[in-house]
Amino acid sequence: MSRIGKSPVQIPEKVSVDIKGLSITVKGPKGELKRLMPEGVNFDQKENQIVVTPATTKRYSRERHGLCRTLISNMVQGVTEGYEKKLEIVGVGSRAQVKGKNLVVSAGYSHPVEMTPPDGITYKVESNTNVTVSGIDKEIVGNEAAKIRSIRPPEPYKGKGIKYQDERIIRKAGKSGKK
């Protein structure tokens, strides 16, 4: 049995969970999330917690046990607290700004790169070099942050590029010149 899947998901007072077959809807103060769960897992809602159990003893059912529990936990946390990823832009002349809802990144190309956020995602820019991506769905927040980082990933020689705020770039030594 999955060690993660064994523990029940606690549901705060402000959150309501609706389970219909494999479809789970979580509503909270920040919004609503709906997700279709994979087969092979049963969900039991008891008072203020959800217990996830494998439907059978087969391997595919046990594999999805911990996954489904974590997905539900992430949904509950998303509608109560939300998620955010912070990125840093390093390099001379590289900066970001918000135009309306869109994020415009100048990262050393001949043209600025404009990104339109999906529903439920907001971009915030502090001091032209710090970008915050926030929303209620952990997966979408992470994907959007990864798309922004992929515009100009950090390079190992000088560290220029777009990186996550807590990311450590492993630096390389440059070429040693002739003497």
UniProtKB/Swiss-Prot annotation:
The keyword RNA-binding applies. Gene3D superfamilies: Ribosomal protein L6, alpha-beta domain (3.90.930.12). Pfam families: Ribosomal_L6. InterPro entries: Ribosomal_uL6-like (IPR000702), Ribosomal_uL6-like_a/b-dom_sf (IPR036789), Ribosomal_uL6_a/b-dom (IPR020040), Ribosomal_uL6_bac-type (IPR019906), Ribosomal_uL6_CS (IPR002358). One of its GO terms (cellular component) is cytosolic large ribosomal subunit. GO terms for biological process: cytoplasmic translation. Part of the 50S ribosomal subunit. Belongs to the universal ribosomal protein uL6 family. This is Large ribosomal subunit protein uL6. It comes from Prochlorococcus marinus subsp. pastoris (strain CCMP1986 / NIES-2087 / MED4). The gene is rplF.
